[in-house]
């Protein structure tokens, strides 16, 4: 889905009419979530669980953060496994993701990215997924998303917030982008990471610091050095905030002839793939997209337009560059040590 414009009004203190009209539904949504979390009895996994989650619906950059944390922990000798819901996939799990066998329609796009870095499990029931990961050899679990899911106890919870958009109009879904009230989320957070550049996240950062929650800043950087010498490019993306991807490309020196955006987790049709191929030829441009979008094009039938688009498009793998990363890792190490002493 595309985020409604009234979720992020140009005037930060204004409340658009649509948000006011939908506020009662937001109240019901928030109340249902609080009741669900209040009644839940979280199951504790046999290994430490680190959660990387969002406060808002849409893309805040949590997956690059999860990948960066995994790389740091693997370098320390941890047997890291990812656990995720697999948004957009048909599998309920628990199931271990196999990139050679599974497509995005099976397990979702993000699990395919995670599986390239560490063993990854998709499970609608997180506690069952954690148990499956432990049986599969996990020594530590990173849960990508699931901050609002009360089924599995977390040993260290990280909230990821986009610095450029913050908490938007501050309303709950569907009146705004919030999955829960800010104070409720902060009461369970051990760290806050602001991704990207901007000041819209300053307010929640101040509230986090007032509670003694450490705040870290992060920017997205390519995992490998890109070669943009043979531009221009037609960039396309179906992610939460595609403009962030386009901005990153420009900052890296790419000449963008055109950009084409799709809804988050969009499954490309044959006609859409063909239109992208034709438009790139008309512009004399090379195609470039995100790793997530490329994951959704994988396993397309050979010679189909989607297969040709997958073959033609350059993809930009990214990781989060987290400021004061050693401090964050030290706090995670402490939480992991405490969990193992239980």
From Swiss-Prot:
Q: Record's Pfam families?
A: LpxK
Q: Which GO terms fall under molecular function for this chain's record?
A: ATP binding; tetraacyldisaccharide 4'-kinase activity
Q: Which InterPro entries match?
A: LpxK, P-loop_NTPase
Q: Reaction catalysed?
A: a lipid A disaccharide + ATP = a lipid IVA + ADP + H(+)
What are the GO BP annotations of this UniProt entry?
lipid A biosynthetic process; lipopolysaccharide core region biosynthetic process
* Entry annotated with the keyword Transport: no
GO CC entries: plasma membrane
Q: Which amino acids does the record list as binding ATP?
A: 56-63
Stretches of the chain forming a coiled coil according to its record: none
Is Ribonucleoprotein one of the keywords UniProt gives this record? no
Q: What keywords is this UniProt entry annotated with?
A: ATP-binding, Kinase, Lipid A biosynthesis, Lipid biosynthesis, Lipid metabolism, Nucleotide-binding, Transferase
UniProt lists the family membership as follows: Belongs to the LpxK family.
Q: What does this protein do?
A: Transfers the gamma-phosphate of ATP to the 4'-position of a tetraacyldisaccharide 1-phosphate intermediate (termed DS-1-P) to form tetraacyldisaccharide 1,4'-bis-phosphate (lipid IVA).
Q: What is this protein called?
A: Tetraacyldisaccharide 4'-kinase
């Amino acid at each position: 889905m595309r985020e409604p414009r009234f979720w992020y009004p140009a005037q930060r203190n204004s409340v658009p009419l649509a948000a006011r009209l939908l506020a009662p539904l937001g109240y019901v949504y928030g109340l249902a979530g609080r009741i669900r979390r209040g009644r839940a009895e979280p199951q504790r996994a046999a290994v430490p669980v680190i959660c990387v989650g969002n406060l808002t619906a849409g893309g805040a950059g949590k997956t690059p953060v999860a990948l960066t944390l995994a790389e740091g922990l693997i370098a320390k000798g941890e047997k890291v496994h990812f656990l995720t819901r697999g948004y957009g996939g048909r599998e309920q799990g628990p199931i271990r993701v196999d990139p050679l066998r599974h497509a995005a329609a099976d397990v979702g796009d993000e699990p395919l990215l995670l599986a390239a870095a560490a063993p990854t499990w998709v499970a609608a029931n997180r506690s069952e997924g954690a148990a499956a990961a432990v049986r599969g050899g996990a020594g530590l679990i990173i849960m990508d998303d699931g901050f609002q899911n009360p089924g599995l106890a977390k040993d260290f919870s990280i909230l990821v917030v986009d610095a450029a958009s913050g908490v938007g109009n501050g309303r709950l879904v569907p009146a705004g982008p919030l999955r829960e009230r800010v104070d409720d989320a902060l009461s369970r957070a051990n760290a806050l990471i602001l991704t990207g550049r901007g000041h819209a996240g300053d307010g929640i950062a101040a509230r986090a610091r007032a509670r003694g929650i450490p705040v870290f800043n992060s920017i997205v950087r390519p995992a490998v050095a890109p070669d943009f010498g043979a531009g221009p490019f037609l960039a396309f993306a179906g992610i939460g905030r595609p403009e962030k991807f386009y901005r990153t490309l420009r900052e890296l020196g790419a000449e963008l002839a055109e950009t084409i955006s799709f809804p988050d987790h969009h499954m490309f049709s044959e006609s859409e793939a063909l239109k992208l191929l034709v438009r790139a030829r008309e512009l004399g441009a090379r195609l470039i997209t995100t790793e997530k979008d490329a994951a959704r094009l994988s396993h397309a039938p050979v010679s189909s337009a989607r297969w040709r688009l997958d073959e033609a498009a350059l993809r930009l793998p990214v990781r989060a560059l987290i400021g004061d990363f050693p401090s964050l890792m030290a706090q995670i190490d402490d939480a992991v040590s405490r969990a193992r002493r239980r």
